[in-house]
């Protein structure tokens, strides 16, 4: 599906509540990080050194 997007959630040491869905993520942060494909997600995670703190990659 072309309308599918991938979202990431990160563990920021308990500062934010666990976000269970992309909708919660969007509402809490006002603008979620979203990507068109899994490759873009993985490239972003690696580029910014987020390997240890990413807790979820969600496809919707």
Regions found by a protein language model. Give the residues of each.
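Short, mixed-charge low-complexity intrinsically disordered segments
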Residues: 38-60
């Amino acid at each position: 599906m072309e309308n599918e997007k991938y979202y990431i959630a990160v563990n920021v040491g308990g500062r934010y509540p666990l976000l269970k869905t992309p909708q919660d993520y969007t509402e809490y942060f006002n603008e979620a990080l979203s990507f068109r494909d899994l490759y873009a997600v993985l490239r972003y995670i690696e580029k910014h050194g987020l390997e240890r703190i990413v807790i979820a990659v969600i496809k919707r």
